[in-house]
Design a protein with these regions (language model features):
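Rossmann-like dinucleotide-binding domain that binds NAD(P)(H)
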Residues: 1-51, 57-62, 131
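Hydrophobic alpha-helical segments typical of transmembrane helices
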Residues: 66, 112-116, 120
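Short polybasic amphipathic segments
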Residues: 68, 84-94
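Active-site loop of classical SDR/Rossmann-like NAD(P)-dependent oxidoreductases
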Residues: 103-113
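C-terminal helix-rich "cap/oligomerization" subdomain common to oxidoreductases
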Residues: 118-176
Length: 176
């Protein structure tokens, strides 16, 4: 969200297998028909002119979880897996060796819910709003449309850029 709303997307998609087998849970071993692309590569253009590339895939035999890299004019930041809410950042620049920035945050998965509850109680807009969620779904639907048509697709929705949590924000702080 800190990059702001997405204006348009382009994408390609593919499906390598017509059926898949559920790998875990109560339905493990059950085969099902694949009805959507299982690999999507997308280009996103933000309203402010920035861009991003994304790959979403179930087609790799390599088991891993996501990672995030942000490249800017001075270097690249490699973030740890956002699914675990912990880990170190690594900053790469052209003029020096990579620098590891040790994580100081340990807010975890409940951060958004805690922030929502505090915002409701304070009567202020929440950061992870329904409008933001709708915009994310609109982006994903636009990616699928772009992959299907082979054309750039305008993302119809927009959303205000959410403010970052303030320095020192503590989800465990007693606020009642």
């Amino acid at each position: 969200q800190n990059f702001g709303p997405v204006a348009r997307v382009s994408a390609t998609g593919s499906t390598s297998r017509q059926t898949r087998v559920i790998g875990s849970g109560p339905r493990a071993g059950e085969e099902f028909a694949v009805r959507v692309p299982t690999h999507v590569s997308a280009l996103l253009e933000f309203e402010d002119g920035g861009s991003a590339q994304c790959v979403f895939s179930f087609q790799s035999a390599l088991r891993r979880t996501g990672f995030l890299e942000i490249a800017g004019t001075e270097g690249t930041i490699v973030f740890p897996d956002p699914n675990y809410f912990e880990g170190d950042l690594v900053v790469h620049t052209e003029s020096s060796e990579p620098v590891t920035v040790h994580s100081v945050a340990d807010a975890g998965r409940g951060t958004g819910v805690v922030e929502l509850a505090r915002a409701i109680r304070a009567g202020v807009p929440e950061r992870a709003s329904g409008e933001q969620a709708f915009h994310v779904v609109d982006i994903m639907e636009s990616m699928l449309e772009a992959a299907d048509t082979g054309q750039w697709v305008t993302v119809e929705s927009t959303v205000e850029r959410a403010k970052s949590l303030p320095d020192g924000w503590d989800p465990r702080e007693a606020t009642l």
